[in-house]
């Protein structure tokens, strides 16, 4: 085995006047800016063994927000639990782990090949790497090939990841370490909860849903290849197709989402993606909850190496320097008017059509719009046309650049986030940390993280007229320096660390484990 060093392995397996466009979500009579620390945790066993299973991790490979969570949350937990990450051995992972050593092996089953398990470390966290070159070492991204098409064998690839997690939990991977709890993330590893039950394991599983819209749907004929009998397939079949996400929801001991509001919204038909009845049942039985994501400590305007100039609550000059840098980078002229930013994938979910619809309004009122991102060709073309139509007011950077994105958060005055749905969202928290006020649709995690008139501005309906009224509020806010400064301070001081989220996850782990004990004794 070329990638792993062999070792001995056991044999056993306030708001300005006229704010009628504001969202009536949470009104507050005054601005608040309070620094907080995580509350006492209470009873938690620091030796709790948790296997955090993910299909991406920003240390190695990232396709979306899950990669950020998978890198940050285990780090926040590592001093308070024995947490280890399991991730597929993509090319990027193998290349980034020269010290990889063999610690176990998952035997073949049905159409799923045998895989080796290697171990490395990332940020002090043990990372278990599922090594199977035929499944994971190829070009493209974790989920799609170079042309943007789903890998044709994704069912087998992510069943292998799911099954590996279950085999490790059952103690049949030849490893000295065995988890007490599986923490599964999204559809690529959700099938692990089903495998656990089918294998007769007592290890509980927690499934975190980062986006219910992605469900891992595959032909029913794939069941035999995945080692799933016709009887077993019944519980994971969604409208005639195998659903990895449904498998996790049905068989996990608890399901949580990445915000409290999103957990509530997915129990209804509008955002339940066909699984709302199932999720409503979970909510009624106390098996559905929400925990808001945190953001990494590197998002600090006092120290961020990507910024043109640093700043803090007492020295704002650095924001102006970053604003000028963004204007130059996007070919926009010097302007003291408000700069609105879009830092997003250019896709329908993110409401880019709404952002484009307010471009004329922003330009006519003396503002500028800076857009960075890539995505759907139709939306990319619409954004490019806007920059040609308003060359002095709309600047576009196609694709993504981490340094420029951070400068946009640090230099822009407002961030447009008219998402049609948003399980949690990270951009609004990045913006707040850098004193950029989110203008957001009141949905999902945006409700939980943006306090209307305090740490940003909210609007209720995902339509252009509602966004236009909210943009008008933004212009009025910008023209009242004292209000703008107070809101920026409140946004920058909003608690958003992973330590806070980590504490909530540790509580949830204990809750899931405690609930399992009476069930086993029954």
Predicted regions and their residues:
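Catalytic cores of nucleotide-sugar-dependent glycosyltransferases that transfer UDP/GDP/TDP-activated
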Residues: 2-522
